[in-house]
């Protein structure tokens, strides 16, 4: 046992020296403390610590660090309400905190992120998967955009993958490529070792999946590199300390602008806390929920009066797709279709007036009763003539 211990220590020293040498060549710095944090990250994900010396991984680090550092900084600075919440849920659910970086890789922590494959939200769920995990998706809400509910769903899903494959890094790979493809890759490789599965020459897994795990590890390493964080912004070191929102009951069929006004909040800020609402009002039917800043909870409990809030029409308008042409503006398009700039912005989740040629916009269409009458009259006339 003592011999094994000394061999392990000697082996880790050799790896550390290798990394120091490589980092010296590429002008990176590695301290014993940072090296140990890297080892801890690998162990948390059930990855053999020797993977840190994998040549393909080491060679990819310089490029991945420079390419994905902005993702980390943006995620920390612009989503300071989301990252602490996710970390808290991960800790409560007793899963590796490094799973946070899966979300960063998937969506950059953007609740309104939509992939080419129509995966939505922080955790990039497809509709069938999301519904199977208990998330509500209908004409009024899309809980894939709710960072709290979707995080619990993602953790549940990842736990099931961990139970199926036995190791956390395999669960991460399966999250990206699917259970079937990972099982097939393991069978072809004759091993579930990470170094073997993401071998760039053997190509047991797609390039996307091979890069997926490398990106997660790169972001996890960067987030634990105090020198890197201090160099960018000293405040980033304590980014996990703020968690400033709470879940409260929301009345049904009420305009979001009225809720925001009642809470002394501007509408844009209220929407940032509640990205799961699809329209400018809460869903009809039984009560729902919303998120508010923690410092508003006492005010909410004392002053919030549901009976003072007017109910609004929650009928979902008919829509059409409009392709932007040269010379178009939101005002011109809104006037053409007898709607408002605000409605077009709301439906398309756009904040500015700038449009691009060939950009696709969802436009609300108001039903024209006279047009319907004329159409029916024409149909009746045609039927008479046909007889």
Feature map (PLM): residue ranges:
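An acidic, Gly/Ser/Thr/Pro-rich helix-cap/linker signature
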Residues: 2, 11-13, 23-94, 99
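Substrate-binding clefts and substrate-entry loops adjacent to catalytic sites
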Residues: 60-74, 109-116, 124-166, 191-203, ...
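Solvent-exposed, acidic/flexible segments
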Residues: 72-83, 92-95, 115-123, 143-154, ...
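Solvent-exposed, polar/charged alpha-helical surfaces in well-ordered, non-transmembrane soluble domains
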Residues: 77, 81-84, 88, 100, ...
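Short, functionally critical alpha-helical segments immediately adjacent to catalytic or ligand/cofactor-binding
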Residues: 95-112, 171-176, 271-274, 344-348, ...
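Catalytic and binding regions of secreted/periplasmic enzymes and modules that target cell-wall glycans
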Residues: 158-188
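Amphipathic alpha-helical blocks and their helix-capping loop/short-beta junctions
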Residues: 202-227
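Extracytoplasmic low-complexity/disordered linkers and repeat tracts associated with LysM-containing
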Residues: 221-251, 262, 267-387
